[in-house]
Amino acid sequence: MLPESFGGRIIYLLQQYGPSFLKGAGVSMWLALVGTLFGCIIGFLVGIVQTIPVDKNDSTAKKVIIKVVKFIMACYVEFFRGTPMMAQAMFIYFGSAYLFNINMSMWFAAIFIVSINTGAYMAETVRGGILSIDPG
């Protein structure tokens, strides 16, 4: 039976659901920490690769490869920065199972989604930071 007062209801809810809430908060913090760690690694790599200069003296093959890789990475950054993370999660977790018959665990999917989303934002931050340095 719920108590009548607001404070009594809060205490009742904390007694009933407090342990579950704390467990969920811990899992969320773990997921955020691991996903952000992997996302930072992805972001640093993508951001650095996006700033590789193409010199006039480079071979044609090298120029083409660098431009194609930069284009793919720019598409990755724009797509994952431009769509909501929840839509990405739904598509990756449910869409991969439906379209490609890939059944991944919910933990792998969660870490993967947070990592690639964070990586896209971090890549743009790293790229912008590198390009803001005066060539002097």
Segments predicted by a language model, with ranges:
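Transmembrane alpha-helices and adjacent helix-loop boundaries
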Residues: M1-P135
